[in-house]
Each structure stands twice: as C-alpha cells, then as structure tokens.
C-alpha cells in the first residue's frame, strides 16, 4: 500500500520538531502534501490508498483531540476514500473511527510506550528500540497478548493492522527481516491495507 505521509514543514529535523499550529496551517499542509503524493502515484498509474501523519504531527495528533479532529475533518471532506493509518489507541484513531473514516491501527516495532498508549518521547533513554532481538520480542509480545505493553508492564488491548519501523532507526534492515520471519512463523500473512479495512 502507498500512502501520503504528511508532516510539519521541518526538513532540517525530518518533521520531528513540534510546531505551533492552527486550522489553516494544518489544512494547507495536508492539501499540499496529499495532492503531491496523489499526483505522483497517478503518474505511475498506481493509487494512493491511505494517509498517515508523520513525526511531530503524528505525535501531537495522538494526544491532542482538537488537532486530530482537524486532520480527520480535512480527510473526510477532501479525501474520503483514503484509509487513516493511526497509532493504536490514540486520539487520532478514536476521532477517525467516530467520524466514520476507514481506520487502520498501527503499532511500533522500534519505540516503547507509556501507560496512556502514547510513544515514549525520544529524549527519554531507551525510547528507541535498536536491538533486533528486543524489537522482535516487543512485537511478538504485542501480537500474542493483543495489547500494547507499556514500559511499566501495563497491557492496553487493541486491534493491530500495521507495524511501523522507522528506516533511520539503527539496525532497521535487520529488524525488518526478523519481523518478516516472525510473522511467517506465526502464519500471519502480509496484506494491503485496502484488503484489511
């Protein structure tokens, strides 16, 4: 599946800098970035199937219901055919589902979680999982228990449609290979989001 992965206009820090926002800013950046992706995929004769906020935009939308609503409202009005790919148990996922947007729930192979199901901030030691064995154990536990597992050990039940792994995480290639091996060993097949939602 190919999706539009929109972020704040922060090229220097790869969209990971939190920026003050308002409705006009959010709608403009979503318009520009989603349309750019759709134009590019159209030229290649393929479809854009989903939308996912990136970096700080995703981080904030997971916690801020007002921001989540602005994103969902824009998608619902302008791109209702797109699946919303949202962090499992996030405010964004909740608002998207309430508003009737097709919603896929995602967990992270290379990030730890807090008790409220949000990602541990990157400035906290250990928030980024770079060891392949630890990452695979992390994902295996999530799948087996059907829950996000916080750093304190709290189980947070959720459905899971997608596993995210950041390409700039150290050892990401090896982690990706091992995730594929794990899923195959559990008889979990890889599918397009449009076939799941």
In which residue ranges do the predicted regions lie?
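Glycine-rich tight-turn/loop motif centered on a GG-T
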Residues: 12-27, 61, 118-130
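Flexible, glycine/charged-enriched surface loops at secondary-structure junctions
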Residues: 41-49, 147-159, 189-196
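Active-site rim beta-loop-alpha module in soluble metabolic enzymes
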Residues: 89-147
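Catalytic beta/alpha-barrel core
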Residues: 60, 79-88
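Charged helix-capping and loop-helix junction motifs
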Residues: 64-70
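C-terminal domain-boundary segment and adjacent tail
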Residues: 82, 174-197
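Glycine/small-residue-rich loop that forms an oxyanion/phosphate-binding "nest" at active or ligand-binding sites
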Residues: 11-53
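Hydrophobic faces of well-ordered beta-strands that scaffold small-molecule active sites
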Residues: 2-6, 49-53, 84-86, 103-107, ...
